[in-house]
């Protein structure tokens, strides 16, 4: 979430100075700061296409003024994206069928792989052979989308390996999953949580908003059992696959919203999706939440404040502060970390560790 409504905070030092004041009612100790490299840190990039005089350009449009900016290079994008951009553009410019009614492209990369998604305002079935040729000639994992249609060439799944405390964690996911877009910072966030857990008495872990298991797989060895919830069926399927990739057997995944989980734990409602999971068998010492920008609603806060330790990963300092007003009635902030996810922008990721008073 952007801090631009509060001022022009771009550097990590400026963000740190603001956050210290903004959260002073909850935390007065030293913040842990995690910097990112300045260039080629972002693994996801989305661009528009601009058509002029029968040729094609990458472009971005100002969301307020709608002013057009021709893009030739993205210094914040992963090196694999930067290297592939001119190759793709040259190929598209030479194929009129691929170029016609093409309006956008999405790049996604991991340490090992790259995929692209081309977005069209026309029936992509009509250019299926052209798209297949593009994928084969440029040796690229390609997805094409138009209204109600999706075509995949080679594969849409990407493999990722994260290095966490001398361990390698293996993942597979696709473009539809929520992905931390700065791999270096993602590794630092997970490592920060692991270092806290190293000092803790631990039983079982409850994780909400687990996605494809980004935190889950790395944290599982610290606990006897893990219950991780997520509403996306696709994410759950990837999470189960990632358990197999890492030979992890102590994680139980449930496709539930946080509100549904709250009802289930309070025994106010039974869910068929929990038929193979006995909630009474868990003894949660820690809960991890990584919510969307809207933060936690009251039902989730009421649920998690029952547990001894809370790890809160936030992409929105504004909703984090609102949630801490409630959580501070039962818990104390023990650690506060700032992760410069998007360098030289007003955006900031926060990590907070709370323990029961």
Swiss-Prot record:
Cellular component terms (Gene Ontology): cytosol
GO molecular function: rRNA binding; tRNA (uracil(54)-C5)-methyltransferase activity, S-adenosyl methionine-dependent; tRNA binding
UniProt keywords, alphabetically: Methyltransferase, S-adenosyl-L-methionine, Transferase, tRNA processing
Class in the EC hierarchy, top level: transferase
GO BP of this protein: methylation; tRNA processing
Binding residues annotated for S-adenosyl-L-methionine, in chain numbering: 180, 209, 214, 230, 290
Residues forming the catalytic site: 315 (nucleophile), 349 (proton acceptor)
Keyword check for Zinc: no
CDD domains for the chain: AdoMet_MTases
InterPro entries the record matches: MeTrfase_TrmA_AS, SAM-dependent_MTases_sf, TrmA_MeTrfase, U5_MeTrfase_fam
EC number(s) per entry: 2.1.1.-, 2.1.1.35
Coiled-coil region list: none
Catalytic activity annotation: uridine(54) in tRNA + S-adenosyl-L-methionine = 5-methyluridine(54) in tRNA + S-adenosyl-L-homocysteine + H(+); uridine(341) in tmRNA + S-adenosyl-L-methionine = 5-methyluridine(341) in tmRNA + S-adenosyl-L-homocysteine + H(+)
Function: Dual-specificity methyltransferase that catalyzes the formation of 5-methyluridine at position 54 (m5U54) in all tRNAs, and that of position 341 (m5U341) in tmRNA (transfer-mRNA).
Family: Belongs to the class I-like SAM-binding methyltransferase superfamily. RNA M5U methyltransferase family. TrmA subfamily.
Protein's name in the database: tRNA/tmRNA (uracil-C(5))-methyltransferase
Origin species: Campylobacter jejuni subsp. jejuni serotype O:6 (strain 81116 / NCTC 11828)
């Amino acid at each position: 979430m952007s801090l631009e409504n509060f001022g022009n905070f771009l550097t990590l030092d400026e963000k740190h100075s603001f956050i210290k004041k903004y959260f002073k009612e909850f935390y007065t100790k030293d913040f842990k700061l995690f910097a990112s490299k300045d260039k080629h840190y972002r693994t996801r990039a989305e661009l528009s296409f601009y058509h002029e005089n029968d040729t094609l350009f990458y472009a971005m449009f100002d969301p307020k003024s709608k002013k057009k900016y021709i893009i030739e290079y993205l210094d914040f994008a992963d090196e694999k994206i930067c290297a592939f951009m001119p190759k793709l553009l040259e190929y598209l410019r030479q194929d009129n069928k691929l170029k016609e009614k093409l309006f956008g492209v999405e790049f996604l990369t991991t340490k090992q792989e790259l995929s692209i998604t081309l977005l069209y305002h026309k029936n992509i079935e009509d250019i299926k052979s052209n798209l297949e040729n593009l994928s084969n000639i440029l040796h690229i994992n390609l997805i094409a989308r138009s209204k109600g249609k999706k075509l995949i060439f080679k594969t849409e799944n990407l493999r990722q390996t994260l290095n966490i405390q001398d361990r390698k964690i293996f993942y597979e996911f696709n473009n539809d999953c929520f992905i931390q877009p700065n791999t270096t910072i993602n590794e630092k966030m997970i490592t920060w949580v692991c270092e806290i857990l190293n000092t803790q008495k631990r039983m079982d872990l409850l994780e909400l908003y687990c996605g494809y298991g980004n935190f889950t797989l790395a944290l599982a060895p610290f606990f006897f059992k893990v219950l991780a919830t997520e509403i996306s069926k696709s994410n759950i399927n990837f999470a189960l696959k990632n358990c197999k990739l890492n030979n992890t057997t102590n994680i139980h995944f449930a496709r539930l919203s946080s509100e549904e989980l709250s009802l289930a734990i309070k025994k106010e409602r039974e869910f068929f999706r929990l038929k193979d999971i006995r909630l009474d068998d868990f003894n949660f010492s820690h809960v991890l939440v990584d919510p969307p920008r809207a933060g936690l609603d009251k039902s989730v806060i009421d649920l998690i404040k029952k547990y001894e330790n809370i790890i809160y990963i936030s992409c929105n300092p504004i909703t984090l502060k609102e949630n801490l007003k409630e959580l501070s009635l039962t818990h104390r902030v023990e650690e506060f970390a700032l992760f410069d996810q998007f360098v030289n922008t007003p955006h900031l990721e926060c990590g907070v560790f709370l323990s029961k008073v």
